[in-house]
């Protein structure tokens, strides 16, 4: 972690003594938290910069989630042509699961990035979970009671 301990700036009218600040501009988070209540003379209303995030997630969980997203994306690349070449109920249900999971994770990232506020984000994620569950249930219902996803797409292409 790069730390800047001294900074030479023009700050004040006292001449050479005021040119060199004896305080750090960027401190490690533990030092910054320790010195948070201390007032630094000559440093006008500048807050400390924290270098570590306030909420840290497990790097293993994030890595596994990222890997899972990539596996589903690559699986879809092979599953779509296979469903075209061999339309059957196994392909229909595989497509239903993979497309729903892929859409859930993608829209979940949009919710995480753009929905602000803890309560609103929880409501949006609950709504997304309900939407994904209804989507999967609807696709499974369509596969069981109608022609299935593969044959439905083929019928649309024949129009």
Curated annotation (Swiss-Prot):
Disulfide bonds: none annotated. The chain crosses the membrane at residues 64-85, 91-111, 121-142. Pathway: Carbohydrate metabolism; tricarboxylic acid cycle. Residues 37-63, 112-120 are mitochondrial matrix. InterPro entries: CybS, SQR/QFR_C/D. It comes from the Eukaryota. Heme b binds at residue 102. GO terms for molecular function: heme binding; metal ion binding; protein-membrane adaptor activity; ubiquinone binding. Keywords: Electron transport, Heme, Iron, Membrane, Metal-binding, Mitochondrion, Mitochondrion inner membrane, Transit peptide, Transmembrane, Transmembrane helix, Transport, Tricarboxylic acid cycle. It is a multi-pass membrane protein. A ubiquinone binds at residue 114. Membrane-anchoring subunit of succinate dehydrogenase (SDH) that is involved in complex II of the mitochondrial electron transport chain and is responsible for transferring electrons from succinate to ubiquinone (coenzyme Q). SDH also oxidizes malate to the non-canonical enol form of oxaloacetate, enol-oxaloacetate. Enol-oxaloacetate, which is a potent inhibitor of the succinate dehydrogenase activity, is further isomerized into keto-oxaloacetate. Belongs to the CybS family. Component of complex II composed of four subunits: the flavoprotein (FP) SDHA, iron-sulfur protein (IP) SDHB, and a cytochrome b560 composed of SDHC and SDHD. This is Succinate dehydrogenase [ubiquinone] cytochrome b small subunit, mitochondrial. The lineage of its organism: Eukaryota, Metazoa, Chordata, Craniata, Vertebrata. The gene is SDHD.
């Amino acid at each position: 972690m790069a730390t800047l301990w001294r900074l030479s700036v023009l700050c004040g009218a006292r001449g050479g003594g005021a040119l060199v600040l004896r305080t750090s501009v960027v401190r490690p988070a533990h030092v910054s938290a320790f010195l948070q209540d201390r007032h630094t003379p000559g440093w006008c209303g500048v807050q400390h910069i924290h270098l570590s995030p306030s909420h840290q997630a497990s790097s293993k969980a994030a890595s596994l989630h990222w890997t899972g997203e990539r596996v589903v994306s690559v699986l879809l690349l092979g599953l779509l042509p296979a469903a075209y070449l061999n339309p059957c109920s196994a392909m229909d249900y595989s497509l239903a699961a993979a497309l729903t999971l892929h859409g859930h994770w993608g829209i979940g990232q949009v919710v995480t990035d753009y929905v602000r506020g803890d309560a609103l984000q929880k409501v949006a994620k609950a709504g997304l979970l309900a939407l994904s569950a209804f989507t999967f249930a609807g696709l499974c219902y369509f596969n069981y009671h109608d022609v299935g996803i593969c044959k439905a797409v083929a019928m649309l292409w024949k129009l």
